[in-house]
Amino acid sequence: MPGPWRPYIADVIAGNCDTYLTDFADAAAAFGHPVLMTFDHEMNGSWYPWDATDGGTSTGVTPAQWIAAWNHVTSLISAIAPNVAWVWAPNIERGGSAVSAFWPGSGGQVSYVGLDGYYVNTGTRWANRFQSSYLDVESASGGSCPFMVAETGIPAGDSNAVFQIDNLLSGARPAGAVAVMYSDKGAYAMTAAMQSKFVADAG
């Protein structure tokens, strides 16, 4: 989208990006197949310009503004392209970044509740990386939407990587995850052994 980041959220809320959004929605509708979309994901992290975790001190974006922008974007696009499904995707919580502050409520569209998070070392497990945040997103949403792991990866060079594939899917399955989106690139690109384990366990 056009424009610098600080006024960008305000521009979205004000409707100044509606032409761009409408063009996208028209293209998505013409595509005619299901499309999974998110908007300004990982909003509770500190690495994107739409970070709203400190009440706007760093980026000028507050949780309330982020929600207003989400609701505007999702409502506009969904009215034109009902084939677009929306994934609300905060990052796993990392101190002071509670997801509940960013739940859009009933003012916009949420089709799936997602959670982004990566395994970082041999000691990473679903229980110590995802579980508490999973419970929080379910609480924030009231269990109103299906859950998915919206973005994840496991370091391919980790000697424990194949086991961690099993751990990831073993944790996601009881959580009722309908999908696990794996970022198969860079340091997280799967080895043949990881691919085989993923396919076998996912089945």
Describe each model-derived feature in a short phrase:
Residues 1-88, 183, 199:
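Substrate-binding cleft of extracellular glycoside hydrolase catalytic domains
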Residues 19-24, 90-105, 124-139, 162-171:
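Alpha-helical scaffolding within the catalytic cores
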Residues 27, 72-80, 109, 136, ...:
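Alpha-helical structural signal in soluble globular domains
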Residues 35-36, 145-203:
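Substrate-binding cleft of secreted/luminal carbohydrate-active enzymes
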Residues 40, 70-99, 115, 144-157, ...:
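Aromatic-lined carbohydrate-recognition surfaces of secreted/lumenal glycan-active proteins
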Residues 44-49, 94-97, 122, 156-157, ...:
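Short catalytic/ligand-binding loop motif for oxyanion handling, primarily in non-cytosolic enzymes
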Residues 51-60, 100-111:
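Short, surface-exposed, charged loop/turn segments at secondary-structure junctions
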Residues 105-159:
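Glycoside hydrolase catalytic-domain groove-lining segments
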